[in-house]
Structures are given as C-alpha cells and as structure tokens.
Swiss-Prot record:
Glycosylated and palmitoylated by host. Glycosylation is crucial for glycoprotein export at the cell surface. Pfam families: PH_Rhabdo_glycop, Rhabdo_glycop_CD, Rhabdo_glycop_FD. Glycans are attached at residues 56, 266, 338. The lineage of its organism: Viruses, Riboviria, Orthornavirae, Negarnaviricota, Haploviricotina. It comes from Rabies virus (strain ERA). This is Glycoprotein.
Amino acid sequence: MVPQALLFVPLLVFPLCFGKFPIYTILDKLGPWSPIDIHHLSCPNNLVVEDEGCTNLSGFSYMELKVGYILAIKMNGFTCTGVVTEAETYTNFVGYVTTTFKRKHFRPTPDACRAAYNWKMAGDPRYEESLHNPYPDYRWLRTVKTTKESLVIISPSVADLDPYDRSLHSRVFPSGKCSGVAVSSTYCSTNHDYTIWMPENPRLGMSCDIFTNSRGKRASKGSETCGFVDERGLYKSLKGACKLKLCGVLGLRLMDGTWVAMQTSNETKWCPPDQLVNLHDFRSDEIEHLVVEELVRKREECLDALESIMTTKSVSFRRLSHLRKLVPGFGKAYTIFNKTLMEADAHYKSVRTWNEILPSKGCLRVGGRCHPHVNGVFFNGIILGPDGNVLIPEMQSSLLQQHMELLESSVIPLVHPLADPSTVFKDGDEAEDFVEVHLPDVHNQVSGVDLGLPNWGKYVLLSAGALTALMLIIFLMTCCRRVNRSEPTQHNLRGTGREVSVTPQSGKIISSWESHKSGGETRL
C-alpha cells in the first residue's frame, strides 16, 4: 500500500472535486508515447504545481483564519431598557403619608444608552447616585407624583456573530436574529419595544477577531496568480476559487474549502449564498503538516526507486508507480510496452472516488472513456490482473479519509441553533430583577387639595357640605327675623316704665317697680 499522503492531493482544480480532497490523480490528457532511456526518468516535484507554466515563486503575505478558530464567535454587548419610576404620595387630614411606587417603560435612544453604559464602565460616581429610586415629595391634603426616567443596563449580554452576513443571534432578538448592525445602525431591537441591544464595542468589525497574518510563496505567470505555497509548505491552487466575505473582510474560498485573503489581479466570481468555508483548527494543521512530510518522503522514495533503476538497469511496474505526479497539473507519464520504456507528456486531474476511474470490471476510465491496454499494461504501474480487474498500486488512504471527514464536519452553519425566543422574558418584567438603573432627571407633579376619598365619596361629601351650608343659611335667616320682631316691643315697654307713677293711699308717689314690689308684699 502506498503511503497515505500519496492519495491526498491538495490542489483541487476539477469542478467535481468541489470541497473534497482527491484520493488519486489520473491522466486527463495524454500525449503520444515515445521510447526513452532509463536516464530520462525523473521524479516530479509534488510540492509545487507546474500548471500552465506558473513556475515563478515570490514571497508574499496573506491572511487566513486563526488556528483554533471556534464555531461560534461570541460578541459581548448589553441591553438597555427605558424605565419610568413613579413615586406617588398622599398626605391626609391628620398628616399620614401614603407612598406608592409604580413602574412604566419607554423606548430609549441609542446615544443615551451608550452614555449610560460609559458612565458605568468609567465608574462615574454620578452613576451610583442615579441608581436610587426618586425621593418622594409630599404636601398636606395633596397627591404628589415624583417621576424619574431610568436607563436599565443589563451587562453582559452575549450574542453569536455569524461571520458570513455579520448577523447576530440571541434569544433576546425577535426570531432569534438581528441583521444589519453597522455604523449607521449600532443597535438591535429585542423582543420588547422598550429594550434595545447594543455591542460593547461600537466598532463591530473589531469584535470579529478570527484572522491572522501568514507568510507564503506566490506562484504566478506574468500578472496572473495560479496559487501559493502556504505557511505549512503545501501548495494551494486558485482554480475554482470564489470571492467570499467573512466579517466584512473580502477573501477567496478555495476549492478545498479553505479561506484566504490575498491580493490578486485574477477575475473571480462571487460564491453562491449557501457556500461555506472549513474551519482552521489544530487538527487540520496537523494533518497538513503530515501531508507535507509525506509528500517529501514520497519524493525521497521516488529518488530511491530511481536510484535502484539506475543501479540495476531494470524497471518494474511497482517502481514506475513512484514516478506518478501526486498533484493535478502537467507532468510525465511512464509505462512499459513490449519491454520498452515509454514516456508521454500528460496532464493530471484529481479523482474523488475510485468509481470515477473504475466504473466497471476491466475498465480504466481516462478522458471519459475506457483506456486501452497493451498486453494488460496501462501506465504508471497500473495493470490488468489475471482475473480481469484493474490493479492500481495505490489504495485509498486512511489519512485522506480522516481529512475528508474533518472537512465535512467542520463547516460554519449559516443559522446558529438557538433556543426558543419565547422562553425569554415571559412576563415582560423578569429582566428588571437584574437591572442597573441610570436615572437622569426627576419630575414632580402636585395635585390640588385631595381628601383621600374615592370618587363616590367625594360626591357624597360635596352633597352633605352643600346641604349643611343650606341648612345653616336657613337657620341664620330665621334667627335674624326673630330678632328683628322682638326689638320694637322691648323698646315700647321700656318707654312706659319710665313715665308711669302710682299714687298710693298714703299720698306718697313711688315708681312702678316699687309699687309692684310693695303690692306684692301687701298681697302677701
């Protein structure tokens, strides 16, 4: 069995290999065969693609996903709720004060929320003072309302950032998603009209810290860039790449699913909306390092096989298999026809499954048709077995299969799995149990005289007061009339008493009071 890296081809230039790593390279185009001497044999350089003459290598820097980049990009933020706290006091006739606190809501403005958050983060003492409820005022026989507008800051409130469309995902958002957060709109609406969500960092792009700068070698032909050798030493082709933005950064999605940002003059189409990229983690890096090491080892094996051919002056099908180009592109093909060593110019393409080149028994598909054999011999060590089956020295690599499974399982979902938004803020005021209040202004409202009675009691009291006043007026008028009648009678009696005199039998004149008194005494 050929080592695992032999079957791993990092260059994906064939459209059918979209997002997959090939397990083999087969001839796509084959030139005429010509006999050669064993001294014309050579080992291919599988670390550099000699495709379309792109042999000019130059150092350059590019940007890729960070190693260890996780699936969910967490973005810290806070929620801001507008709350109006109302303290209502009533002072009754005897001076007893009753205080009632009420709470209402209003929709805050982003600027006010940002200022309140900065107060809290800066440790401004005014923020601590603003956390208190409004101090209630009171007046005798009056209802006094003291109101304070508050900005309730709940921090932190973490949301998941989708790197593809820069949308945010959290249970606090309507339908669990917030789109369009940018410089012009720095907040998200939530499940409540009076609450908004804002990122802690107003510059959303800085929160998407998933990129790193790397150094590599660019393979170009004139002004056209064919591919590049990455920092791990593995060549990556730009054929089949498409443009894709991650967190607002424009880059290229390569055929193998990796994402890079690099300057190129090539005209590239945009990726389909459902196109994803592969994660860049330690496991994929480790496999890539193993592949590079294996490719280097395979070249050493090829050189050993070539040395053995030169030494023994003999060639076998097994030794010829070492001379096969392991990456897509232009190269050489070798075979042995009638004990004659043959060579041909060839172009290799990648193969995703063995069924692509082995559709049926005895058929080796090359260029869309079954390739003819010469006395059971094809090329690059491929022969026809005694049972009629095509025998390929290389078998599918377990390392490659592991890498393919890694790619299939490490893609970023466009929609993050989130809990049901209806489970958040069921009663509307649950968030207020964990609030931090920013209270800017206090407003007082003083009512008129209030006796503290309900509406029907007020009407009864007014009716009783009016009836009492009417009775008092009638009583006063009656008293006044009686006084006016008694005053003339008293005046006449007082005038007669001063002028009348009584002459007793003794001839002594006495006053009427004395005569009345004496007469009384006489009657006794």
